[in-house]
Amino acid sequence: MHCFIIFSVINLALLQLALGASLPTSHATYPQSQPHATKRSFGPAVPSSVNGFGPFGSTYISANQRQSQQSDSNYSYNSGFGPYGGTSISASQHQRQDSQSNYEYYNNGGGLYSKDAKKELKDPSTSA
């Protein structure tokens, strides 16, 4: 009788090992169904598929503009929507924006510059 119990326990352990090796474990990683959220320095994370929404126009890279920005402030406007219409403006005005267009905006006192000609274009705010 004791041999039968020991034999049953050993068989049960071997069966669990065999099934455990074939079944996926609870620690397996699966691809995420939701889009990855980009990290922002101000406010909550926003999904990268959303473009131009949020309290400050969102600081992530939009798919159609393909632009990158560097800012010294805690939040900045970088959106095709909203009051600033696609021009990146940071709170401290120390920001450089690079895009695939021919223009760079230097908001640190700067004016509008052409990437190709490397000369300053006429700034409508300082036209005399």
From Swiss-Prot:
Compositionally biased region (Basic and acidic residues): 115-128
Organism: Uromyces appendiculatus (Rust fungus)
UniProt protein name: Infection structure-specific protein 56
Disulfide bond positions: none
Stretches with biased composition (Polar residues): 27-36, 87-101
Region (Disordered): 27-48, 86-128
Function: General role in the development of germlings including formation of the infection structures.
